């Protein structure tokens, strides 16, 4: 085994008082490190998204990685998965604006969207120069920012047209580009 990708989702898990899903990352990590202890062999572990919803569990996971001496990383696994459509920005390209649309929530879906976009944008001229600024818009503030031109309406439309999850806003109308009011009914909790 050259490495372990820990993904603990796609199940029906309860939420805590902060609204976080109680994904069993810690429990999966304990099973992984149990194998490491039993075999005496380790491999780098990449934890999809964050380590845990609980600081003490996250700290224990980190401490265990230090104790057993294996590389331990966390973030989105999406930058290394296949893309639909299969696209990469050419190395050294000039990039003026980038946008990513995602249908997932803010307990992991946000990091997936941001890191998937960053993985593609870092191919731009200047390379891995980081993120200069990030603004979050939620609910009505999202639609207000859209109306105010906080991002390119053409880029927004291009992203929306590539969606594999866009349902017709009106029954019986397939491949119909929704109006702003229809978008609001399709996206109950938008954020950008």
Residue ranges and their predicted role:
Residues 1-44, 57-60, 66-68, 122-133, ...:
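N-terminal glycine-/serine-/threonine-rich beta1-alpha1-beta2 phosphate-ribose binding loop
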Residues 39-121:
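A contiguous active-site-proximal alpha/beta segment in oxidoreductase catalytic domains
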